[in-house]
A protein has these predicted regions:
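Intrinsically disordered, low-complexity, positively biased terminal segments
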Residues: 1-7, 17-18, 22, 42, ...
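Active-site-proximal cofactor/substrate-binding loop regions of enzyme domains
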Residues: 10-104, 111
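A structural microfeature
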Residues: 61-62, 128, 196, 259
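Hydrophobic, ordered structural segments
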Residues: 86, 108-110, 116, 120
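Conserved catalytic-core motifs of GNAT/GCN5-like acyltransferases
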Residues: 104-110, 125-139, 257-269
């Protein structure tokens, strides 16, 4: 017998941790998403997960993850509700709980067309749109002549400084995990100065490129090309529509649009940092 609306509204929300990884991946699969266990492990370790257990004992009924960057910003991602409980107000209730937990902290998230009305009703506004593109990199359009090399441990402090400048906030807990999380990590260098960096991390049968931080489009293109040379998988990344030259170049090189999402914020007029040099997020779930 289906659980009543009153009983559903009383189910407790609890914190999720690394031990809930498989349950989160199962919920992703239930909604037609990829399991993405590698990404889930990062998010549940570096962020704070919230979930509602299914009273029928079938794992999680709903979940979400918050990645905090201090009092200046937190990102909400992976908001999922099991198919059997869809359209019953569970997603809105979980989001309201997360909003209470985050208090006055400004928030950001990427929203699908289906999810955007829910978030607008909770006070989020759209500030940009981003295309997810995916495909085998063809090397049809050449990359600019920019020096790119594998990152080393000695680069870490310079990478953190550049990321803090461009992202606008300190995300050391995430960036310091990149060497272990990513299969490939590259830096662009000009005159001994690091001018950009990018990672390619494994996600099912693809390599996701992110973060992609660079002083200009040419540097971003060179970083992507270097990662593509190192990869034996299709590539996937999320690029804001403002970066028309980079998007056009990626499409010339065989990556096609999969979906367009809204970049949204709450309690802040825009994201901190420099959007012109912030080309791709580490993952849309972490902003």
């Amino acid at each position: 017998m289906p659980i009543s609306p009153a009983a559903l509204a009383q189910l407790p929300v609890r914190r999720l941790g690394p031990a809930d990884l498989l349950a989160c991946a199962d919920l992703s699969e239930n909604r037609g998403w990829l399991r993405e266990e590698h990404k889930w492990e990062l998010l549940l370790t570096a962020g704070t997960g919230y979930g509602i257990d299914d009273p029928e004992g079938e794992g999680l009924l709903a979940c979400s993850v918050v990645t905090s960057y201090g009092p200046g910003l937190a990102a909400i991602g992976m908001v999922l509700v099991a198919e059997r409980y869809a359209r019953r107000g569970v997603g809105r209730r979980l989001m309201r709980y997360v909003l209470e937990e985050t208090g006055e902290t400004p928030l950001t998230l990427y929203a699908t067309a289906n999810g955007q009305p829910l978030y607008e009703g909770l006070g989020f506004t759209e500030i940009a749109r981003a295309e997810m593109v995916k495909g085998r990199f063809s090397f049809s359009a050449p990359a600019p002549d920019v020096t790119v090399r594998p990152a080393t441990a000695e680069d870490l402090q310079d990478v953190l400084r550049l990321d803090r400048e461009i992202f606008g906030l300190d995300r050391t807990p995430l960036i310091t995990r990149l060497p272990a999380f990513a299969d490939h990590l590259r830096v662009a260098v000009d005159g001994g100065v690091i001018t950009g960096f990018a990672a390619a991390w494994p996600n099912m049968d693809t390599h996701v490129i992110g973060p992609l931080i660079a002083r200009d489009t040419a540097t971003a293109q060179a970083l992507v090309a270097s990662l593509a040379e190192a990869s034996d998988r299709p590539l996937r990344t999320d690029i804001e529509l403002r970066h028309t030259a980079l998007l056009g170049w990626l499409k010339e090189n065989g990556l096609n649009t999969i979906i367009t999402n809204a970049v949204m914020v709450r309690s802040i007029p825009d994201l901190p940092g420099d959007a012109d040099r912030r080309f791709a997020p580490l993952t849309v779930a972490a902003g």
